[in-house]
Amino acid sequence: MESVFTARESFVRACVRSFVSSLPDILISRLRGDEEDSMKLFCSGDDAPATTPKPKDGTRGEKGDRSGKQDVDRFGYYQMIMFSIISLPLFLSAGFTLAYVFTAGEVKYRCLVPECENANDTSFDVPWAAESAPDISEMSKCARYEVINHTDQCTDQVFSNVTRKCDSWIYDPSENTILSEWGLTCDVNRWKLTLVGTINNVGQFVGLIFAGYVSDRYGRRTILTLATFLSGISGLIHSFSVNYWMFLAFEFIDATVGAGIYSAGFILGMEMAGVKGRVLASTITSCLFAVGEVLLGLIAMWTRSWRLILRLVYGPALLAILMPFLIPESVRWLLANGKHDKVERIYRKMARMNGLSINDEAIGEFKEVNMVKTEKTEQLEKKNPLMQILGSSVMMTRLLACSFCWLTNTFVYYGLSLNSVAFAGDKYTNFILVAIVEIPAYFLTWFMTDWLGRKITLSSSFLLSGVFCLAIQFVPSGSWSFIPLILYMGGKWCITMSFSTVYIYTAELFPTNVRHSLLGICSMTGRMGSILSPQTPLLAQIMPALPLILFGCMSLSAGLLSLIFPETLGTKLPDTVGEAENIGKPQLKQDAQDSPS
């Protein structure tokens, strides 16, 4: 009895020592929700008390086999390293998507008064500038007062009340955009600035058509590497544009070749993470995009030059040429395409880098679960997967509903962002702050999707965003002026949560062999919302409250429509159309416990 007690005491001490040294693993595991797995790591078989029964045949036993399989699948240091590498294109994709906000942005300018100054020898802030124009509105940039009683040096008294159109302009030298580069001033040229954003979104729309096909046909790593590297080349050429039309052409090319970067990185991270780490992977990728927005804002604030912005944003993308040597292909994509030997090598490397042992029995069980297909599954896979989708009313209904949710997300998200310019402040600071606000929203999404489920998180965030947007119309004016701002930011917070949720939800609702293609279709539909959202400020000229009413009604509709989706919390990613149709059923949840993800 005493020897048993001593053995148990030694075991406890060994566990305590290992607990201290393995504290980072515990924290990571708690975030994943698999504390039992991490406890098994540092309370290994070598520390077990002598009285612990062992299988007589020298094998690990049934429980050991299951644990070995879970070890291979756990979100450990291997996954952390892979996410660190994937973070580069995810950072850059934010800059690729939103750089036009600064490259084609407004700058301060005023009319040149040739009677008082020389274009080559003057300054933007001259003492008489305020008196040379009718007022401080937009008209002051495009019209000026005529000069009377001209002397060698102008004063406030030399201007008459007669106005004339400006022939040339003086720009604020503190920043340089295509507006000041090519004189895109006044209302007659305003369409050229807004066209840049439209062309960017059209390019992404076109690019998503090809990105989804390349990803599902040739692999996630292939499209991620190719799109990032080609974007780097195109973006650098873009920065040397000699006129507006060359700039516009490469804006389209940049957006087209880079359209699949974020979705490919997102899916690669999702398929790498497994069931327990899936929401964590979604949160990380969303936060990486938000951090990329912050970095873009800091670069723009520091350089204030559209050419330097493009070079600093697109230049690092050339490093993507190294990506095939640093990250593996998606395991789920390899399995779906019958490349089982490569999968085994990846899992062995994963176990080695995570400091785990893996035996042939665990690999054997892995092969049995993932490589042995029934005749029914093989017959299904011989069919065109897209034709299977078209032939399934469940999948088509799901696809249409997802597409509307994406359309609403992008329309409301970008619409609220664009209409927020009514709030005063430095544009660089405002851009950075809006990006930072998204990060806590993503982490709240992580908590809610893991604890409450995907369906309730998506539906409630849509509904609350709609309520916030509509509630602004009922706030009395005057002393209640701060309430609309709070409600407005609440709407932006909730639509950010729905944006994060719909990405992971869409990836979980569709089978592996068409996942990126269908995600691309949804994203393409959503891109229509981002194309239309720049026009929403024009609706305010008809009725000031019309944009927010439209945002609110669409959000409420999407929130109700999303209730038709099945809950995917705790289920494995479906590999076939049949599995996708049966998502959420008890047997699928059991499969998630018995097979790697």
Put a short name on every predicted segment.
Residues 87, 194, 225, 279, ...:
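Conserved glycine-rich helix-kink/hinge and helix-boundary motifs of the Major Facilitator Superfamily
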Residues 94, 98, 251, 255, ...:
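C-terminal transmembrane bundle
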Residues 201-209, 290, 294, 438-443, ...:
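Residue-level signature of mid-helix packing/kink "hotspots" within the transmembrane helices
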Residues 93, 258, 262, 273-324, ...:
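Glycine-rich segments within core transmembrane alpha-helices of 12-TM secondary carriers
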Residues 208-228:
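Conserved MFS/SLC helix-loop-helix module at the cytosolic interface between two early adjacent transmembrane helices
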Residues 56-80, 134-192, 353-418, 422-423, ...:
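Flexible cytoplasmic loops linking transmembrane helices in multi-pass membrane transporters
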Residues 105-160, 280, 303-375, 552-590:
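Central mid-sequence intracellular linker of multi-pass
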Residues 219, 240-245, 303, 475-476:
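Helix-breaking motifs and short loop linkers at transmembrane-helix boundaries and internal kinks
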